[in-house]
């Protein structure tokens, strides 16, 4: 097995869940094993993310084409990767990093490197005839993540008046992942009924959650809690709530402007203290803009010992930024998005650094997704403990949940559900 090499790499342009072009890479090994990987794309993008290479030709897919990236894979990356040992993932990923030669993948694109990196890992697992989570995580890969399920979409993920990007339910009281899915689906059904009864629109946003024009954030909380309780569940015991605020999207001139509010940092932190004491909110993602370092210090100091404070735009799956956060006591959890950094190895380095320093880790999808289920395997492989992959509608979201259901059955009695955060 150790002498099985990469024989061919083929990239092509496909479409993601929003109809935007993205990359699919196919790897063929010397023993004719084949594997494919597709990469996602974000709508709310952190300033410090690795660069996603687009064509920027306004006459072709409105500038969103990825033919440049596809050509780079086929003509530049492939010749330097072909012939390498399939099982040496770290060496392959380091070669991809070297080919790019920049700090942020700006030359060949993180979408190019990630597609190749993931396809090779999947091919390696396939040729060894073991699941991907076991190949990259070993015998300790057995923790099924608690899902943070986005039931109401707002912000840049929906065409409505809600400023906060995601309102999530967290089934922390389930005994296994299968139960978490059942409980959450029941709440999702009930939520739809309640929204209809209040004459709110039940169309869905990019990530599959409902996207109604609800007037206030507090009303959203009340409606979700009502759906949970009318489904026969109790707050905290069975479910808690989470928010992805995406505060950078409404931060300007050192002020946070959303709904009818205009807050400075101190006032915004007080607002969060109020809503987290009033409602069972146990996770806040990007509650502060990425460049507001003092704000991150303040909210971590004020709420970090009570709830989960998640950095997404703050860290962008980058070890240097995570290390800076650790040293300066910014946040207590890291959102992990492989396409923010560009290779499987760098993704795992970010996870390990966070976990080593007692930061929670949450593997995450993007708003523009495909049917690729690699993040489900990464969640289990790295024992991340939590996953964000959208709501309980749209098949590109359900594909990840269904893969986790399959993994739980495969692990059988070895499977452990992470549960409470």
Swiss-Prot record:
<protein>
    <recommendedName>
        <fullName>Enolase</fullName>
        <ecNumber>4.2.1.11</ecNumber>
    </recommendedName>
</protein>
<feature type="binding site">
    <location>
        <position position="366"/>
    </location>
    <ligand>
        <name>(2R)-2-phosphoglycerate</name>
    </ligand>
</feature>
<dbReference type="InterPro" id="IPR029017">
    <property type="entry name" value="Enolase-like_N"/>
</dbReference>
<comment type="similarity">
    <text>Belongs to the enolase family.</text>
</comment>
<dbReference type="InterPro" id="IPR000941">
    <property type="entry name" value="Enolase"/>
</dbReference>
<feature type="binding site">
    <location>
        <position position="337"/>
    </location>
    <ligand>
        <name>(2R)-2-phosphoglycerate</name>
    </ligand>
</feature>
<dbReference type="GO" id="GO:0000287">
    <property type="term" value="F:magnesium ion binding"/>
</dbReference>
<feature type="binding site">
    <location>
        <position position="285"/>
    </location>
    <ligand>
        <name>Mg(2+)</name>
    </ligand>
</feature>
<comment type="function">
    <text>Catalyzes the reversible conversion of 2-phosphoglycerate (2-PG) into phosphoenolpyruvate (PEP). It is essential for the degradation of carbohydrates via glycolysis.</text>
</comment>
<feature type="binding site">
    <location>
        <position position="367"/>
    </location>
    <ligand>
        <name>(2R)-2-phosphoglycerate</name>
    </ligand>
</feature>
<dbReference type="Pfam" id="PF03952">
    <property type="entry name" value="Enolase_N"/>
</dbReference>
<dbReference type="GO" id="GO:0009986">
    <property type="term" value="C:cell surface"/>
</dbReference>
<dbReference type="GO" id="GO:0005576">
    <property type="term" value="C:extracellular region"/>
</dbReference>
<keyword id="KW-0964">Secreted</keyword>
<dbReference type="InterPro" id="IPR036849">
    <property type="entry name" value="Enolase-like_C_sf"/>
</dbReference>
<dbReference type="InterPro" id="IPR020810">
    <property type="entry name" value="Enolase_C"/>
</dbReference>
<keyword id="KW-0963">Cytoplasm</keyword>
<feature type="active site" description="Proton acceptor">
    <location>
        <position position="337"/>
    </location>
</feature>
<feature type="binding site">
    <location>
        <position position="244"/>
    </location>
    <ligand>
        <name>Mg(2+)</name>
    </ligand>
</feature>
<dbReference type="GO" id="GO:0004634">
    <property type="term" value="F:phosphopyruvate hydratase activity"/>
</dbReference>
<comment type="pathway">
    <text>Carbohydrate degradation; glycolysis; pyruvate from D-glyceraldehyde 3-phosphate: step 4/5.</text>
</comment>
<feature type="binding site">
    <location>
        <position position="312"/>
    </location>
    <ligand>
        <name>Mg(2+)</name>
    </ligand>
</feature>
<dbReference type="InterPro" id="IPR020811">
    <property type="entry name" value="Enolase_N"/>
</dbReference>
<keyword id="KW-0456">Lyase</keyword>
<feature type="active site" description="Proton donor">
    <location>
        <position position="207"/>
    </location>
</feature>
<dbReference type="GO" id="GO:0006096">
    <property type="term" value="P:glycolytic process"/>
</dbReference>
<feature type="binding site">
    <location>
        <position position="165"/>
    </location>
    <ligand>
        <name>(2R)-2-phosphoglycerate</name>
    </ligand>
</feature>
<dbReference type="Pfam" id="PF00113">
    <property type="entry name" value="Enolase_C"/>
</dbReference>
<dbReference type="GO" id="GO:0000015">
    <property type="term" value="C:phosphopyruvate hydratase complex"/>
</dbReference>
<keyword id="KW-0324">Glycolysis</keyword>
<feature type="binding site">
    <location>
        <position position="388"/>
    </location>
    <ligand>
        <name>(2R)-2-phosphoglycerate</name>
    </ligand>
</feature>
<keyword id="KW-0479">Metal-binding</keyword>
<keyword id="KW-0460">Magnesium</keyword>
<dbReference type="InterPro" id="IPR020809">
    <property type="entry name" value="Enolase_CS"/>
</dbReference>
